[in-house]
From Swiss-Prot:
Protein name: RNA polymerase II-associated protein 1
Ribosomal protein recorded as keyword: no
InterPro entries: ARM-type_fold, RNA_pol_II_AP1_C, RNA_pol_II_AP1_N, RPAP1/Rba50
Location within or outside the cell: Nucleus
Upper taxonomic lineage: Eukaryota, Metazoa, Chordata, Craniata, Vertebrata
A single GO cellular-component term on record: DNA-directed RNA polymerase complex
Assembly information from the UniProt record: Part of an RNA polymerase II complex that contains POLR2A, POLR2B, POLR2C, POLR2D, POLR2E, POLR2F, POLR2G, POLR2H, POLR2I, POLR2J, POLR2K, POLR2L, RPAP1, FCP1 plus the general transcription factors TFIIB and TFIIF.
Phosphothreonine: residues bearing it: T329
Biological-process GO terms, alphabetical: transcription by RNA polymerase II
Ranges of compositional bias, category Basic and acidic residues: 39-54, 85-95, 269-282, 519-539
Superkingdom of source: Eukaryota
Positions of the UniProt region annotated as Disordered: 35-54, 60-95, 161-215, 269-310, 504-539
Alphabetical UniProt keywords: DNA-binding, DNA-directed RNA polymerase, Nucleotidyltransferase, Nucleus, Phosphoprotein, Transcription, Transferase
Residue ranges with Acidic residues bias: 509-518
Length: 1400
């Protein structure tokens, strides 16, 4: 139905009819009214109002399973109907709407609506031109009443009007005598004249402080004036001296800061008035002060006393500063120069002259914009921008405090500049440039000040330049220069891919041991204590953990995915991620599992197709292959086999490997250097995956590519000069082939059915037929490299290529020998051929001998200072400290022989293990003079290098070489009928190495215990008269023992016969934990399916303690302490006897192995033999062994080193152990002489008096059973009697024990002699320096001795002369007292002498 529109002439009746027809028709209106939104203005006309839908729950649509226990998503505000959701909005429009930059303001220019502006026509005037507009005239015009101005603006305007108002004619009285150009002064009015004090120059026109602004009444001004007049009246009634006194009293009561503020306020006001007066007469020049003085005197009358008092007081309170002179005279007409604020213009002055430091006081360090440390007296020009700071403005450079303050600036450029300077400072500190020029550590100071979290907060900035600066500073802090280069260059070494985690090794109660097979649930599940610790506490112990707790990884993901920064920022972020992945397995898992982080990196920086990149820096790294991204994947894969499997499967890394390896570096359409590094990292990533037995299918696909790459190696090696990047690529390719060859070996059988040892072995996709043709291609490479052995410069340029060739051949022969279906004669003949063609000519070359000679120069053990930590090393931030690279003569230097010799020894051991007939020919290596000299220096008594991150890394590679030499020596010993001359040296080296091996080398320690340490062939003394020599030595020093079975020679012979039992005992108590042993065994044997990670355990300490020969005895002691009922006698006697036998062998023939154990620690371990059981010491074998070991401790050359006062390893307190020993002796000894000898040994005079006080004070009952004869005392008697005792408390205990009869010569001859000697020396001492208390005690004790009823004891105490153990009494006596002693006795009181009745 069409309704016609109203036509002209129709009335309202027609309109009402049309409306009723429309309503009856029910048609939709042509226009719809919509209520506009208050927040967004008018709504869209085409948008329908939202309909009210109800939520209806349908049972059929409900799921069958209960919902997962996942946290509900965070609630968000529901948008209004007229406001689209953020995800429906164009991102560009959203960014434009939220953009607050100044450019956004300038780009949105809206023309102002002038339709409502009133247009005022010009006023008709008879002047041809309008008057010139002056700004001063505008100020004098009163504002319209209708205009609204703020109170503050009105006050400022009124103040300006009052200041600019010129004085009236009657107020200005020019001086008749004033010269031309003099400044007229103001004459006070009649009202002000009444407020002027007589005889004073100051008039009080109005109150200075009380203004009445806070009063709301209309009479506020009158009230203020009344108060002012009262104050003036009181001041007029006071003398100047009283005013000054009251002023001083008031100033003493007020706050100095308030006084300073009031003075500054008054000074500013007076200065403003003076300048306003001068500005009213701009045509007159200013007059010097000297010419103004008489004029002012004429104007004001007489000089004011109060001015002099004021000036005197001002000089006392604050020094006067020179007035600031402006370079021009300010004009009143200038904009904003009506009031000159001089305090704000001080910065325009020239800098004061630099003050030279005359003392040695410490000064605040200042740095340049490049992070250089500036000298305190350096004078630099100001245009360099190094003087824009407040404190010490004359000194150039910025302090750390000022840079921290600048990072909080509102100007983004200043924040970025401060972060850049801080990053330069951190980088130079990491590089060791500051050295000893600074007190303390810069990095420690920065971290304590919160630098880490300052960088984290800066990452959340909205400005790209600030983010870039923060990322660069974070990289400078976390990534030490040289660390990554060192680890990359040694990747192809012998087990070079296995590294220690770069996490702090210090103990922390919140740190938990990480399991090798760390699952995702365990990584995500934190302990309540660690989860509740704030990031600053975590960062104090571990910087990386503290950073990860601040959601650093999601922020990195946002920066990479959303902001798309430049190449430098991308490389910095990747470097930081690599450092985080090296921290631990937990950190690597967190990097891997950060949402969309790895996906973004793989998608953006490892694409499979890209546009060709020209020479020069790339504008962007996005959609371009990046070698750093590939390295990140490799480091993540090194953390665990699960991570490597996920990278290969979930992130499509297989296709990336195929893409980057299939083409040669020169064909990758990338810069040559970047292409070389990218291919190298691809080889390394594949090698890491192959270390777990993964990636075998890629080998079949890329087999032609690898063969072609191998064939090109010899020609590349013959070109000169050799490129370091190419050498690293070749070595990485050979390392990859080594791991692939090991993957083709037969899977070993599980050693047991336990869970930790039984790993489900997936059959390898690589078989022997796939790798059998690799050796003919690698041997030409080795032959080509060995040609350069006589040219050191070319040999050093080869890098790890020769080592990688040797390691590949060792893996090849090992895998070949494990093929059960092949004829052994084939590989045995090939080994003989290889020996004749390669090894024997190599071993006879002089350059190889020079390599053995250079071992000492490059050894960390022989040069402990080379492993010393840097001054900037932090325990919470692990770094290898390789700033500036390694020196050539170091373990990782370019001239280091360690990588090649270690690989050569590994190959020789493999050949000797497979072909026993080659051992004698290969043993020629052991006779190298340089190797023997190196071993002699390694076993020499010297302090071990401090265990730092770099020393742990370097020592691990050095221990590999030492172990391989010992393994070869063990193989050679089995094939030689007579022991070699260096056998004893090799045995000492094995003993020393066993106590030095670090975590991760559990398999090596176990092999040493099995093969070298307890091997009878490594003890040539047993067959060459060693026992007889021991008996002869003991006979010369101690006298011949009656029982031949008690002699040391017989005990040594018995110990050599019991070596298998001794080895079983130590294997049971000193072997590493089974789980760690199996992990290490899989790594060193090449059992790839059982390798769980290439991250080694944290090197907190060596695997075995330095006193490992006593470890079974210590375990037995702890078991006995925890078992009150006692241990089985058979186990106790057997373990104790084996330990004592082995310790006796080491004491006699291998004292170098016990140099690290001090004699006091050995004595404490012997005392544990008696504390284990109450009957153990009665066993005859135990007594003989303990007596022999005690005799070794009491030798004249060992006894001076027996120090019981210093801290002992493994012992908290020797006095506590000795107290327990006395209790045990008193309870179970029954006067055993050997037991008593151990009790007496710590009572020597040079040891602590605490031990003697414990015996004579708390364990006097021990004296009754301590019946060791003087002839059996293992040390000279003079060790107990000399020097004289100086402890008064102990002397009194001696005397009390003698007088009471607790100490007698019949049951305790040794201590009886000691007590008599010290008491006699004390009572007859006439030292004038003694205190009054000592003199009184001495006189009292002498009187008591004189009055003793026991004539024998009195005779001994008075006539004692010298100790003599050959006499029955143990000492000599004076037949008659010397004259001096007789005279001293005459000083006693007469009654004492008469009562004594003793004749001298």
């Amino acid at each position: 139905m069409m309704l016609s529109r109203p036509k002209p002439g129709e009335s309202e009746v027609d309109l009402l009819r049309f409306q009723s027809q429309f309503l009856e028709a029910g048609a939709a209106p042509a226009v719809q009214l919509v209520k506009g939104s208050r927040r967004r203005g008018d709504a869209h006309p085409d948008q329908l109002p939202p309909q009210d839908h109800r939520d209806v729950v349908m049972l059929d649509s409900l799921p069958d399973l209960p919902p997962a226990l996942l946290p509900a998503p965070s609630k968000r505000a529901r948008p209004s109907p007229g406001r689209p959701l953020p995800h429906d909005e164009d991102p560009e429009e959203r960014l434009n709407r939220h953009d607050e930059h100044i450019t956004a303001v300038l780009s949105k220019i809206v023309e102002r609506d002038t339709s409502s502006v009133t247009v005022t026509l010009p006023v008709p005037s008879g002047v041809a031109f309008p008057p010139v507009f002056h700004r001063s005239q505008e100020r004098q015009v009163k504002p319209a009443a209708s205009s609204k101005r703020s109170i503050f603006a009105q006050e400022i305007a009124a103040r300006r009007v009052s200041d600019n108002r010129a004085p009236s004619a009657e107020q200005v009285v020019p001086s008749p005598d004033a010269p031309e150009g003099a400044v007229p002064c103001e004459t006070p009015s009649s009202k002000d004249r009444g407020s002027q004090l007589p005889g004073r120059s100051h008039s009080f026109h109005r109150p200075n402080l009380i203004t009445g602004k806070g009063l709301r009444s209309q009479a506020a001004v009158q009230e203020v004036q009344t108060i002012h007049e009262e104050n003036v009246a009181r001041l007029q009634a006071m003398d100047p001296e009283e005013i000054l006194k009251e002023q001083q009293q008031l100033l003493a009561q007020l706050d100095p800061s308030l006084v300073a503020f009031l003075r500054a306020h008054n000074h500013t006001r007076e200065q403003t008035e003076t300048k306003a007066t001068k500005e009213q007469n701009p045509e007159r020049p200013s007059v010097p002060v000297s010419k103004e003085e008489p004029i002012m005197s004429t104007c004001t009358g007489e000089s004011g006393t109060r001015d002099k008092l004021e000036d005197k007081l001002e000089d006392k309170l604050q020094p006067r500063t020179p007035a600031l002179k402006l370079p021009m005279t300010p004009n009143k007409e200038w904009l904003h120069m009506d009031t000159v604020e001089l305090e704000k213009l001080h910065w325009t002055q020239d800098l004061p002259p630099l003050r030279r430091q005359q003392t040695q006081e410490r000064m605040q360090a200042r740095f340049s914009l490049q992070g250089e440390l500036l000298e305190p007296d350096v004078d630099l020009p100001t245009h360099l921008g190094l003087h824009h700071h407040g404190e010490e403005a004359e000194r150039a450079g910025y302090s750390l405090q000022e840079l921290f303050h600048l990072t909080r600036s509102q100007v983004s450029q200043q924040r970025a500049l401060a972060l850049h300077v801080l990053s330069h400072i951190v980088g130079r500190a990491q590089a060791g440039e500051f050295g000893d020029r600074l007190v303390g550590s810069v990095l420690r100071l920065l971290l304590d000040a919160g630098f880490l979290f300052l960088l984290r907060f800066s990452l959340d900035d909205r400005i790209d330049s600030v983010i870039a600066a923060a990322v660069r500073a974070l990289r400078a802090l976390l990534v030490a220069p040289g660390d990554e280069e060192l680890l990359d260059s040694t990747f192809s070494w012998y087990h070079g891919a296995s590294v220690f985690p770069m996490m702090p090794s210090h103990d922390d109660k919140e740190d938990e041991d990480e399991d090798e097979e760390l699952t995702k649930e365990k990584v995500n599940r934190k302990t309540p204590e660690e989860g509740s610790r704030p990031p600053p506490d975590l960062a104090r112990h571990d910087v990386i953990k503290g950073l990860l707790a601040t959601n650093l990884l999601p922020r990195f993901r946002y920066v990479l995915e959303v902001t798309c920064p430049g190449p430098s920022v991308v490389l910095d972020i990747l470097a930081v991620l690599i450092r985080l992945a090296r921290h631990s397995l937990e950190s690597a898992m967190r990097v891997l599992e950060c949402p969309r982080l790895m996906e973004t990196i793989v998608r953006e920086f490892l694409p499979t197709s890209w546009s060709p990149i020209g020479v020069g820096p790339a504008p962007s790294l996005y959609k371009v292959p990046c070698a750093a991204a590939m390295k990140l994947l490799r480091v993540l894969a090194s953390a665990g086999r699960n991570i490597a499997a996920r990278l290969l499967s979930s992130f499509d890394v297989r296709s990336r490997l195929c893409r980057f390896i299939a083409e040669a570096p020169r064909d990758l359409a990338l810069p040559f250097e970047e292409a070389e590094i990218l291919t190298t990292e691809a080889f390394r990533l594949w090698a890491v995956a192959a270390s777990y037995g993964q990636g075998g299918d890629l080998y079949r696909e890329l087999y032609p590519v690898l063969m072609r790459a191998l064939q090109t190696l010899p020609p590349e090696l013959s070109t000169h000069p050799l490129q370091p990047l190419s050498m690293q690529r070749m070595a990485s390719l050979l390392t990859l082939l080594t791991q692939l060859t090991l993957a083709a070996s037969t899977q070993p059988e599980a050693t047991s059915g336990s869970v930790e040892s039984c790993v489900v072995a997936i059959p390898s996709s690589i078989t022997w037929t796939h790798v059998s043709g690799l050796k003919p291609l690698v041997e030409p490479c080795l032959k080509q490299t060995l040609k350069f052995l006589r040219r050191p410069d070319v040999w050093n340029a080869l890098g790890p290529v020769p080592s990688a060739c040797l390691l590949f051949l060792g893996a090849y022969y090992q895998t070949w020998s494990q093929q059960s279906g092949l004829c052994p004669e084939d590989w045995l003949q090939d080994m003989e051929r290889f020996l004749d063609e390669f090894l024997l000519p190599l071993l006879s070359q002089p350059p190889l001998g020079r390599m053995w000679d250079s071992l000492r120069d490059c050894s960390p053990l022989c040069n402990p200072l080379s492993c010393a930590s840097t001054p900037e090393a932090l325990p919470s931030l692990v770094s290898l400290g390789c700033a500036g690279g390694c020196p050539p003569l170091s373990v990782a230097g370019s001239a280091s022989p360690f990588p090649f010799l270690t690989a050569l020894l590994s190959l020789i051991n493999t050949l000797g293990q497979i072909h026993k007939g080659l051992c004698r020919q290969l043993a020629v290596v052991l006779t190298a003079p340089g190797l023997q000299n190196y071993f002699l220096q390694c076993v020499a008594p010297a302090p071990a290098p401090q265990l730092t991150p770099f020393s742990a890394w370097a020592l691990r590679h050095e221990y590999h070489l030492q172990y391989l030499v010992l393994s070869l020596a063990q193989k050679a010993a089995t094939s030689q009928p007579e022991p070699a001359a260096s056998t004893a040296l090799h045995h000492v080296m094995a003993l020393v190495l066993l106590s030095r091996l670090l975590p991760g080398s559990e398999f090596l320690a176990h092999e040493l215990l099995l093969s070298c340490v307890f091997r009878l062939g490594f003890l040539p003394e047993n067959a060459s008269g060693g026992p007889e020599a021991a008996d002869f030595s003991d006979g010369l020093s101690l006298g011949n023992s009656g029982d031949p079975h008690c002699r040391r020679g017989a005990l040594l012979v018995q110990a050599c016969q019991d070596l298998p039992s001794i080895r079983s005992c130590y294997l049971a108590h000193c072997s590493p934990a089974r789980a760690s042993l199996l992990t290490s065994q899989a790594l060193y044997r090449g059992e790839l399916p059982r390798v769980s990670s290439l991250l080694l355990p944290v090197p907190k300490e060596p695997l075995l303690p330095t006193d490992w020969p006593f470890q079974p005895l210590i375990h037995l002691y702890h078991r006995a302490s925890d078992t009150p009922s006692g241990l089985p006698a058979a186990d106790t006697v057997g373990i104790t006897m084996r330990v004592l036998q082995w310790v006796l062998v080491l004491e006699s023939w291998r004292p170098e192995a016990l140099w690290a154990v001090p004699p006091a620690a050995r004595l404490a371990r012997l005392m544990c033999v008696y504390l284990v059981d109450s009957e153990l010491f009665r066993e005859t074998p135990i007594q003989r062994l303990v007596a022999a070991l005690l005799a070794r401790l009491c030798q004249p050359q060992v006894l001076p080193n027996l120090k019981l006062d210093c801290p002992l390893p493994g012992l908290t307190s020797f006095p506590d152990l000795y107290a327990s020993f006395l209790d045990h002796f008193e309870a179970v000894s029954f006067g055993d002489h050997l037991f008593g000898a151990l009790v007496l040994l710590p009572l020597q005079r040079r040891f602590s008096v605490t031990l003697r006080l414990a015996l004579f004070g708390e364990h006097v009952g021990v004296l009754r059973a301590l019946g060791l004869p003087l002839a059996q005392l293992p040390v000279p008697l003079e060790c107990y009697t000399e020097p004289a005792e100086d402890s008064l408390a102990l002397l009194q205990l001696y005397f009390r024990a003698l007088v009471t009869g607790a100490l007698h010569a019949r049951w305790c001859p040794v201590l009886y002699t000691v007590a008599v000697a010290h008491v006699n020396s004390f009572v007859f001492c006439q030292d004038p320096k003694s205190s009054d208390e000592v003199k009184a005690a001495r006189r009292s004790m002498l009187q008591k001795v004189w009055l003793l009823a026991d004539k024998d004891l009195r005779q001994h105490l008075l006539h004692y002369k010298l100790p003599n153990s050959s006499l029955p009494e143990g000492f000599e006596l004076y037949p008659q007292l010397p004259r001096l002693r007789q005279q001293y006795l005459q000083t006693l009181p007469t009654e004492v002498l008469q009562n004594g009745g003793f004749k001298t």
